[in-house]
A protein has these predicted regions:
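Alpha-helical transmembrane segments of multi-pass membrane proteins
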Residues: 1-249
Length: 250
């Protein structure tokens, strides 16, 4: 939505890049992760995914991802790709550990992974009928924190090396409540976390917005009824410019 729809594969590629980086990170540190430490590792990684999802959203909505014919385009979209990839680093590491350290067979773990992915796809479609995309992203982070709560119940979660005091990585229940509350509150206001620039247009978040609806790949916002010259693509040079009542759709 922040850019143009043909960049959907760019977003998917950023997600796959993050997951691959997470899996490689686990592989290069394979001696550090054992079957006994799996509950704690999955708990911390799920919490990391939840926190990174919220922080990534906060950065992403501030980026002016507009298509400009200058070298600025390269660092701009590089920054966007890295911001999008960070949460998936944690999810990729978690999936890699679940597949390689779990006491269950790979078939069972992979089936659970695919079932979760399918539920997530359908869940996003359902959630977007009730709230906006940034709020759904925050609620997705809450879902990851919920997974961390379940992982924590499977065994002890000792503090990670180098962490003297327990933080949110060790308190998935608190993280779940915070992200769920913020996600619900964000969906109840037009002044919450929202993109600054949408398809080359600066978002003003005016109170005159009459209707706003999101789906899996777009957003429609309708302004108030007003008098203005006809606004359309490819008008005839003979078309009258008499102002008419119309609404602005973005």
């Amino acid at each position: 939505v922040m850019t143009w729809y043909h960049l959907a594969f760019f977003v998917i590629s950023a997600a796959m890049f993050g997951m691959t980086a997470g899996a490689i990170w686990v592989h290069t540190r394979r001696e550090r992760f054992t079957r006994e430490s799996l509950p704690g590792d999955l708990t911390r990684l799920s919490c990391g995914f939840a926190i990174a999802t919220a922080l990534s959203l906060c950065v992403q909505v501030t980026l002016a991802t507009t298509l400009v014919m200058s070298a600025t385009l390269l660092p701009l979209f590089t920054e966007l790709a890295l911001v999008l990839a960070v949460p998936f680093f944690f999810s990729g590491a978690a999936v890699s550990l679940a597949l390689t350290r779990s006491p269950f067979s790979i078939g069972q773990v992979y089936a659970a992974d695919l079932a979760g992915a399918a539920f997530g796809c359908l869940g996003v479609l359902g959630a977007l009928k009730f709230t906006d995309a940034p709020s759904v992203i925050l609620l997705t982070g809450a879902g990851a924190a919920g997974a961390a709560v379940l992982f924590a119940r499977c065994g002890p979660v000792p503090p990670a090396a180098g962490i003297a005091r327990p933080g949110l990585l060790q308190r998935p229940g608190l993280l779940l409540l915070v992200l769920a509350a913020v996600g619900i509150a964000n969906g109840r206001t037009h002044r919450g976390l929202q993109p600054v620039v949408v398809k080359d247009t600066l978002e003003q978040r005016r109170t005159g917005t009459q209707y706003e609806k999101w789906n899996s790949f777009s957003r429609v916002a309708m302004g108030p009824l007003g008098l203005s010259p006809p606004n359309l693509w490819g008008p005839s040079p003979y078309m009258p410019v008499t102002p008419i009542e119309q609404r602005v759709l973005i």
